[in-house]
Amino acid sequence: MKPADWLILQKKVRFGDCDSAGVIHFHNLLKWSHEAWEESIEIYGIPSQDIFPDFSIRKSQIIFPIVNCEANFLAPIKIGDLLKVKIVPHKINTHLFQVNSFFIKNGNKVAEGKIIHCSLDIDSRDKIELPDQLERWIEASNVSTNLKEC
């Protein structure tokens, strides 16, 4: 599997995504950013229940609350637009990681989202190291970037 398989996704803008001005409602960009990295880890091969807690089975003992996020709009995004969503994750330290999402329309970047998550123990809420499978996803996602830098 090539990184492009799990790092470049598609999103079609629907009527319900937009406000009365006919452009996406601002909160949808962060929603799409989060959904994109969720989809990315699933395509990579990490089951979502291994990352996100399911309190009915308590399989995951780790939670990843968002500690910082931002959205930047560079051009209007309208109903019917087909966007490429490029995911760029990176590890900040042992318990923090960031996922940048770049939204591209017709070859031009039209928006970007940034979400920073903190890895916490589900019971104590203490900071803990990122799980191995998440670290592997981040590392694999950055292999092509690291090769270009060499």
Swiss-Prot record:
InterPro entries membership: DHNA_CoA_hydrolase (IPR022829), HotDog_dom_sf (IPR029069)
Domain of life, source organism: Bacteria
GO biological process, one term: phylloquinone biosynthetic process
Statement: the UniProt record of this protein carries the keyword Signal: no
Record-level Gene Ontology MF annotations: 1,4-dihydroxy-2-naphthoyl-CoA thioesterase activity
Keyword entries, A-Z: Hydrolase
Active-site residues annotated for this sequence: D19
Pathway: Cofactor biosynthesis; phylloquinone biosynthesis; Quinol/quinone metabolism; 1,4-dihydroxy-2-naphthoate biosynthesis; 1,4-dihydroxy-2-naphthoate from chorismate: step 7/7
EC number(s) stated in the UniProt entry for this protein: 3.1.2.28
Catalytic activity: 1,4-dihydroxy-2-naphthoyl-CoA + H2O = 1,4-dihydroxy-2-naphthoate + CoA + H(+)
The keyword Cytoplasm belongs to this UniProt entry's keyword annotation: no
Family: Belongs to the 4-hydroxybenzoyl-CoA thioesterase family. DHNA-CoA hydrolase subfamily.
Annotated HAMAP family: DHNA_CoA_hydrolase (MF_02101)
Function recorded in the entry: Catalyzes the hydrolysis of 1,4-dihydroxy-2-naphthoyl-CoA (DHNA-CoA) to 1,4-dihydroxy-2-naphthoate (DHNA), a reaction involved in phylloquinone (vitamin K1) biosynthesis.
Protein name: 1,4-dihydroxy-2-naphthoyl-CoA hydrolase
Organism: Prochlorococcus marinus (strain AS9601)
